[in-house]
Amino acid sequence: MTPDLYAALLSWAVTLSGYPAPAEPPVVVIKQHAFFVLEACNDQPCKVLGWYSGGKNVYIEDTLDPENSLFASSIVVHEMVHYLQGVARGDDALKPGVAFNQAPSCEQSIQWEHEAYAVQREYILRYGAFLPVGSSMLHVHCEPGSANPEQH
């Protein structure tokens, strides 16, 4: 992937989300799916293709081709929105070994996902296409006293 492509996708995320452009772009790191299963999904099978876990890195699965696939580029835009959310909270400048300066609440995590999926859908629509991204979020809610969203 080219830095120009990532800069353009970050620009889409800024434009569609309303967040200000960050002083520094994220570092896009390409990873195999096993990384996402282990790190993002707590070693459980999952369909995660992109992940932002705080800091400066945005992780994208190695099978995605954002240069030639609208769906793949929309995933990068989605993760760029999460980076912008992190920058807005100050999570792009972290102490070593921590993902977030302050762990987001369950409700905040769900709100961020809704926001990122809304931007992803709008990005896809601007290209004249419809892909039903984010529908799994309809069944996600917070259990009382839980820090993590649950899907039912």
Question: At which residue positions do the language-model features occur?
Answer:
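Non-catalytic terminal regions of proteins
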Residues: Y59-D62
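Auxiliary, metal-adjacent structural segments of Zn-dependent hydrolase domains
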Residues: M1-G55, D65-S69
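Sequence contexts marking disulfide-bonded cysteines in secreted/extracellular proteins
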Residues: A40-K47, S105-E107, H141-E143, Q151
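Long, well-structured alpha-helical subdomains associated
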Residues: S109, L125-H152
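Short active-site segment of divalent metal-dependent hydrolases/proteases
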Residues: M80-Q85
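Surface-exposed patches in mature extracellular/periplasmic domains of secreted proteins
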Residues: P20-V27, D91-K95, Y127-L138
